[in-house]
């Protein structure tokens, strides 16, 4: 197989506090590069912004091009469990930035953990009373 045909997996964890992008090999065993919104912006409140996600995705794209990876399968994950099941604002910006950087995109998959009746949500029997 040619060196240009190498593929990896981008694990995008996008919460409402931060966006973390980890690129592994196709098996998921070896981490190739990892960037987060907190590494590319100065203030804490901007970590989850689409701009921070876009900057992190551009750094990821530069790193994987150096390593000879041509395409990525993307796994998007939200907080899940007892938390919100919708990805944060950085998820879509990450995918768009990776596509614009000239990286082939294979599958886009949602891997948010969903509870199968484990522990209950915070708030108690009658919910959060405001």
From Swiss-Prot:
Q: Does the keyword Ribonucleoprotein apply?
A: yes
PROSITE patterns of this UniProt entry? RIBOSOMAL_S11
Give GO MF terms, alphabetically.
rRNA binding; structural constituent of ribosome
Region: Disordered; residue ranges are 109-130
- State any GO BP term from the record: translation
Q: Name one Pfam family in it.
A: Ribosomal_S11
- Cited Gene3D superfamilies: Ribosomal protein S11
Report keywords, A-Z.
Answer: Ribonucleoprotein, Ribosomal protein, RNA-binding, rRNA-binding
Which Gene Ontology CC terms are recorded? ribonucleoprotein complex; ribosome
Per its database record, what is this protein's job?
Located on the platform of the 30S subunit.
Similarity annotation: Belongs to the universal ribosomal protein uS11 family.
Cross-referenced PANTHER family: 40S RIBOSOMAL PROTEIN S14/30S RIBOSOMAL PROTEIN S11
Q: What does the subunit comment say?
A: Part of the 30S ribosomal subunit.
Designated name of the protein: Small ribosomal subunit protein uS11
User: What organism is listed for this UniProt entry?
Assistant: Methanosphaera stadtmanae (strain ATCC 43021 / DSM 3091 / JCM 11832 / MCB-3)
Instruction: List the taxonomic lineage.
Output: Archaea, Methanobacteriati, Methanobacteriota, Methanomada group, Methanobacteria
Gene encoding this polypeptide?
rps11
């Amino acid at each position: 197989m040619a060196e240009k045909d190498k593929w990896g997996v981008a694990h995008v964890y996008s919460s409402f506090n931060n966006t973390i992008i980890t690129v592994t090999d196709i098996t998921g065993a070896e981490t190739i590069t990892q960037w987060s919104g907190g590494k590319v912006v100065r203030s804490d409140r901007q970590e989850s912004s689409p701009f921070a996600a876009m900057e992190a995705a551009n750094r990821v794209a530069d790193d994987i091009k150096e390593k000879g990876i041509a395409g990525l399968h993307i796994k998007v994950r939200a907080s899940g469990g007892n938390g919100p099941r919708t990805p944060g604002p950085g998820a879509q910006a990450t995918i768009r930035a990776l596509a614009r950087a000239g990286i082939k995109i294979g599958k886009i998959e949602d891997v948010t953990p969903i509870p199968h009746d484990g522990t209950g949500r915070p708030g108690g029997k009658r919910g959060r009373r405001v």
